Amino acid sequence: MNFQLNGRALRHAPTPVRRILHSSAFIEGWAHYAEELCVEEGFAAGDPRFAVGVWLEALVRITRLACSIGVHSAGMTVSEGAARFEADTHLSGPAALSEARRATFDPTYGRYTWGKLEIMKLRDEARRQWGAGFTLNRLHAALLNLGSPPLGLMGTAIVRG
């Protein structure tokens, strides 16, 4: 769904640069944000399994970000990363070890959470700046009109929105 919505927005982006260049952190962050937004907006509210699934995956994704940072800048070992996955998520044994190993060769696998957190920060800022004029539709339209921007340029959505 995130690729469909983002893909549709990309086809209508106002410039060729915005239609062609893509930020994986934005795309994956948008997907993670949309999952959480579904819970916030009450999707499947009568079935707690949906929310539990979203939160379980969020734990895996935030642990990926922590391990990626740990392995690449704080001297975390693969064994320590696997232990972190076992302590903080539902993963254990080979699954936890596989996730920890991934941090050694894919330093961007934390981009899901990073992108989501930046979008949520932007949402809070838009709410603050736009006041009573804030709506999710307005924010999402302004954001998707940028195409698939690098995270550092998402703030222009507030100015243009």
Indicate where each model-derived feature is located.
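N-terminal maturation segment of proteins
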Residues: 1-161
